[in-house]
Each structure stands twice: as structure tokens, then as C-alpha cells.
């Protein structure tokens, strides 16, 4: 079984805190960390979004002060503050979710995307290497590696196969630095041709698969996990996962039965 614990433009420091939070209730054998975050700015509007969905704990409180901007902290420390003039439109569901949290996700953290963006060319993503930022991110990658070692978890830093990628030079730097930390690094763009991806139907935008591409990559990734001696967990909630399979299958069948919809996504999503 697996779960997606990722948000938009998730930085490496936030990934560290997300991992600690996840491991407070879960015992993963392996974690995959998307390495593009090594080049993200230390702050963007997505930092608040990513922190908002974390349960209350030190793993949310610490990055609220170290990663969020000063004007975002009040809304993160006191979430109802963020409602401002919307108080009279709040429902019991709003309060209960804030207090009790959310129900189990029927897609285990995955976002089902059925629209497609036809891709014409594969390009380098225009990252600018900022040494101070990269160095800080590398320190957090080292903290992730150390935490995983304590918990007997295999960490795998990887690049998702897509059509807007870090340059060969930056990819080589990632490989060298992750190997220096003694952790696995996989560039799945190297397996791009093996995935039998259709550039006209399998991407939502230049950076993300839709469900068609995700199915192909997931099958490839599942077969590769066997290389690490991993086997499916026998401790999972079988009924919950069967329901998730039924839910995903229903969405897939509905999308497969109709024409391919265009996503209208921009050429270079931010």
C-alpha cells in the first residue's frame, strides 16, 4: 500500500516535516522524495497551503515559524482567523473538519486528472541554481536521510518523468550530492521511452501526468520496488483499499468511455 503526501511546489524542508508527521502514525518501508524541490524557492504561496493540511503537532508548528512568512503565521496558528468576513457563511462541516480532521481520502492522496495537454517538445526547465538555497535544501535532505536511517526506512530521491526537466548539469549535481549522502537517486526520465507514454494523451501539463500517464508510471514503479526486496503489506485495511480501488476504477472507466478532454494548461506551469 502507498500514500501520496505531497503538495504543490513542496520544498525539501516541508517534506522533512511531512515525513516526520506521517511516521507518527505510519511505518513505511520506503519513501519516495521528488527531488525537483531542491531547486524551489524557500517560500511561495504554496507553503501556507501545504502547512494548512497538516494535523496540529510540533511538525506543523516548527515550519510555521521557519518556512512560512510573517503575514501567514496568524492564519496558520489560528486557522479561523483566515476566514475574516466569512464567519456568517461557515457551516458545522467547516468547524468539524478543523477540529476532527478529514475523512479517509478515497484516492490516498492522489488527484485524479482526466484532461490532457498534447506535448510537442521535451525541454529543460529553467531553474536558476541558488547556492545558498540549494545548500539549505541539501541539509534538509541529509536530515531526511538520517531520520529514515533511525526508522529503518529506505529513502529514494527521484525525478518524475516529465517533459520540462532539470538540465543534464543540474541532474548530474543531484546525483553526485545524493550519492554523497549515501542515498538512492533515480532519474526516471531515463526510463521515459520504456513507459510507452503517448505525448498527445498522457500528460495534464508539461510537469504532471494525467491518469493515463500515472497508470503507466505506477505500473513501472511497482515492478521496480521488487528490486529493493519490498513486498505488499499484510497489515493494511483491506476493506478501505478495496473501496479505493473501486473508486479509482469508476473514475477511470468513466474517463476511458469518453473522448480525450484538453486541459488547457499553460506551457510552463509555475
Model-derived features with residue positions:
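Membrane-embedded segments
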Residues: 1-67
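Active-site-proximal beta-strand/loop segments in catalytic clefts of secreted hydrolases
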Residues: 5-8, 34-36, 158-162, 188-191, ...
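Acidic-and-aromatic substrate-binding clefts and catalytic sites of carbohydrate-active enzymes
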Residues: 9-13, 133-135, 161-170
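Extracytoplasmic/secreted proteins, especially bacterial periplasmic and envelope-associated proteins
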Residues: 14-17, 60, 73-82, 136-143, ...
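Sec-exported extracytoplasmic/periplasmic mature domains
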Residues: 20, 24, 146-150, 222, ...
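Loop/turn elements at helix/coil->beta-strand transitions in domains of secreted/extracellular proteins
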Residues: 27-30, 149-156, 181-184
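Secreted/periplasmic serine-hydrolase-like ester/acetyl group-modifying domain
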Residues: 46-154, 234-270
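C-terminal regions of proteins
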Residues: 172-267
Amino acid at each position: 500500500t502507498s500514500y501520496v503526501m505531497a503538495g504543490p511546489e513542496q520544498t525539501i524542508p516541508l517534506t522533512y516535516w511531512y515525513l516526520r508527521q506521517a511516521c507518527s502514525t505510519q511505518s513505511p518501508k520506503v519513501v519516495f522524495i521528488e527531488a525537483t524541490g531542491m531547486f524551489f524557492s524557500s517560500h511561495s504561496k504554496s507553503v501556507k497551503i501545504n502547512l494548512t493540511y497538516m494535523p496540529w503537532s510540533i511538525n506543523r508548528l516548527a515550519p510555521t515559524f521557519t518556512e512560512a512568512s510573517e503575514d501567514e503565521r496568524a492564519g496558520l496558528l489560528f486557522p479561523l482567523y483566515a476566514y475574516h468576513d466569512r464567519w456568517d457563511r461557515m457551516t458545522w462541516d467547516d468547524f468539524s473538519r478543523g477540529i476532527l480532521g478529514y475523512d479517509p481520502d478515497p484516492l490516498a492522496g492522489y488527484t485524479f486528472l482526466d484532461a490532457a495537454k498534447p506535448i510537442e517538445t521535451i525541454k529543460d526547465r529553467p531553474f536558476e541554481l541558488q547556492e545558498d538555497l540549494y545548500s539549505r535544501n541539501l541539509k534538509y535532505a541529509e536530515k531526511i536521510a538520517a531520520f529514515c536511517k533511525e526508522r529503518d526506512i529506505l529513502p529514494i530521491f527521484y525525478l518524475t518523468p516529465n517533459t520540462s526537466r532539470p538540465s543534464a548539469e543540474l541532474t548530474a549535481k543531484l546525483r553526485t550530492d545524493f550519492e554523497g549522502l549515501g542515498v538512492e537517486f533515480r532519474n526516471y526520465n531515463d526510463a521515459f521511452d520504456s513507459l510507452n507514454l503517448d505525448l498527445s494523451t498522457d500528460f495534464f501539463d508539461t510537469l504532471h501526468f494525467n491518469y493515463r500517464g500515472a497508470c503507466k508510471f505506477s505500473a513501472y514503479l511497482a515492478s521496480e520496488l521488487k528490486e529493493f526486496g519490498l513486498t505488499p503489506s499484510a497489515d493494511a485495511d483491506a476493506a478501505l483499499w478495496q473501496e479505493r480501488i473501486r473508486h479509482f476504477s469508476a473514475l477511470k472507466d468513466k474517463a476511458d468511455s469518453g473522448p480525450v478532454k484538453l486541459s488547457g494548461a499553460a506551457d510552463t506551469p509555475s
